[in-house]
Design a protein with these regions (language model features):
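Strand-loop microenvironment adjacent to phosphate/nucleotide-handling motifs in alpha/beta enzyme folds
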Residues: 10, 40-61, 66-229
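N-terminal Rossmann-like NAD(P)+-binding domain of SDR-like oxidoreductases, especially those catalyzing
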Residues: 1-52, 56, 228-229
Length: 229
């Protein structure tokens, strides 16, 4: 991240967008910590130059991305006739690839530097995801096996923390904007007419959708496709 920030300043890049994740909020493993540090370096970089606007976007799980849970579950169903989950109470945020791209463009078009853009995205029980995929790809013998949560895993993820909520705004129906908690040489008067968020945290435990909604999201993303014989 530091190398990219330095290169952006050296070559006068107009807009720098750090793509982050919910793992950056109260991180519990090295991956989350590096994402959190990357966010902080990006926001702080706004004080190093006036030529580049440094912005973050923070999202949940992009459906179908490399190593994501959906193709992993589908492969388990097809090869082992089961799905393994760590905890039936676990929830996660999900968005499609097209929604992730929209988040990038939203940040690029509407940021002035220092903000973190968060999509108002749905969340689901991982067990419900397994059920929907089993219903589509499995059979009456396909099982869900609960193997126990790993020490670094969270039951629920958070996109906006309690520390960040006092400086967070509802940008529109689809996006929230977190303003920096450090002093940045930027003006945010364009948010004066926007409502501050009223919740303490934006957690995957609080925005849960049902299996029908998840089915439609998976269809929209092109993940429920019957194979031709």
């Amino acid at each position: 991240t530091i190398n990219l920030i330095n290169s952006a300043m050296k070559y006068g890049v107009r807009k720098f967008i750090d793509v982050s994740t919910d793992k950056a909020v109260s991180p519990t493993n090295l991956y989350g910590m590096t994402k959190s540090v990357g966010e902080k370096l990006t926001i702080q970089a706004n004080n190093l130059t006036n030529d580049t606007d440094f912005v973050c976007i923070r999202g949940g799980n992009v459906l179908g991305s490399n190593g994501s849970v959906v193709p992993y579950f589908i492969n388990q169903i097809k090869t082992q006739n089961k799905v393994t989950i760590t905890d039936s109470k676990m929830t996660r945020f999900f968005l499609t690839l097209s929604e992730a791209i929209s988040l990038l463009f939203e940040a690029a078009e509407n940021s002035v530097g220092g903000e973190t853009f968060v999509m108002n995205m749905p969340s689901f029980y991982i067990s419900d995801l397994a059920k929907v995929l089993i219903e589509f790809y499995g059979n009456s013998e396909t099982k869900i096996e609960e193997i126990g949560i790993r020490e670094w895993e969270k039951v629920h993820e958070v996109l906006i923390s309690e520390h960040e909520s006092p400086t967070s705004y509802k940008f529109d129906e689809n996006y929230y904007v977190i303003l920096p908690t450090i002093r940045i040489n930027k003006g945010y008067s364009h948010l004066n007419n926007h409502e501050k968020i009223r919740f303490k945290t934006f957690s995957s435990a609080d925005n849960l959708k049902d299996e029908e909604y998840l089915y439609k999201l998976l269809m929209k993303g092109g993940f429920l496709i019957k194979e031709r014989c």
